């Protein structure tokens, strides 16, 4: 592991015991995903799910179990097939809004099943009684890529 990544992981591990952000890794390890796509649950009562990942039944079931019927919204960082296909499945099952940006029409590498109920823009804010999520548009990796800053946790989900 690169020194910078090791430091980042160590910092995340130190915060994990008191953090309201829980990381869950899908079993889709590979060249582009490393050990697998990371999904995140933010909060303890009013939970936000970020990047539900691919449609892998065991992963989606695990997210539902850990979300404990408290997931109120699903956000995606971008619509590559390893990040967003689980959104529709879980959104339908939980009856919660899907949030993110539209798929670029000219990009065939995108997950076309993702249709946000709410389109997020740079500068948008999601507030709950536990935390705030600040939306940052970061095109590059994907034209519809968003990052989510959780100031209370000093954490940016990319």
Residue positions per predicted region:
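N-terminal amphipathic/basic-hydrophobic helices that include classical n-h-c signal peptides
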Residues: 1-11
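Active-site HxH/HxHxD metal-binding segment of metal-dependent hydrolases
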Residues: 6, 30-35, 54-134, 153-154
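A detector of low-complexity, intrinsically disordered, Ser/Thr/Gly/Pro/Ala-rich segments
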Residues: 9-13, 42, 123
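Conserved beta-strand hairpin/beta-sheet module of binuclear metal-dependent hydrolase folds
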Residues: 15-66, 147-158
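Short beta-strand His + acidic residue motifs that chelate non-heme Fe in jelly-roll/DSBH
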Residues: 135, 146
